[in-house]
Amino acid sequence: MVSSCCGSVCSDQGCGLETCCRPSCCQTTCCRTTCCRPSCCVSSCCRPQCCQSVCCQPTCCRPSCCPSCCQTTCCRTTCCRPSCCVSSCCRPQCCQSVCCQPTCCRPSCSISSCCRPSCCVSRCCRSQCCQSVCCQPTCCRPSCCISSCCRPSCCESSCCRPCCCRPCCCLRPVCGRVSCHTTCYRPTCVISTCPRPLCCASSCC
């Protein structure tokens, strides 16, 4: 029984035995739960029932194996799903839009497809992530100060740039030393009691 099962041809009778868990027995018809071992992790055995933690190898990284195979060695583009967004899987090849979670917000993951509000943490604030949907107080940094991010929540002192000098940014005392209620809408923005000169653009005076 063992010899007939662990040969080149696998039958359904005895393929699930632990004694059959050999590389020669890792056929498509022999992929059982009991056969899910590292030596059996070939491409033909990559099925949901074979996606155990011990069988998480790069050759087994397929969509059907995510999320139970979200290990460092199984972080592939095909495995980039929200359930797979653990810290060990935060790599550039896993930074797809469907895999953009707070746990994956790392500098290496800061690509344009990952610019979502859930990914707007301080360590993910880069220029390519400064879109209008990603303009949060935690992302208000000089590198994030582009025109699309000019909102009241992004008008902090560290983000006070000419491109961010808009009327919506002149409503709170965050763009200078004093309040911007009245002095920011006047041509006399260059006096000492008003905000910084670089915040006194024509659109903000």
Curated annotation (Swiss-Prot):
Domain of life: Eukaryota
GO cellular component: cytosol; keratin filament
Expression sites by tissue: Expressed in the hair follicles.
Keywords from the named record: Keratin, Repeat
Region (30 X 5 AA repeats of C-C-[IRQVEL]-[SPTR]-[STVQRCP]): 20-173
InterPro entries: KAP
Function: In the hair cortex, hair keratin intermediate filaments are embedded in an interfilamentous matrix, consisting of hair keratin-associated proteins (KRTAP), which are essential for the formation of a rigid and resistant hair shaft through their extensive disulfide bond cross-linking with abundant cysteine residues of hair keratins. The matrix proteins include the high-sulfur and high-glycine-tyrosine keratins.
Subunit structure: Interacts with hair keratins.
Similarity remark: Belongs to the KRTAP type 4 family.
Protein name (database record): Keratin-associated protein 4-6
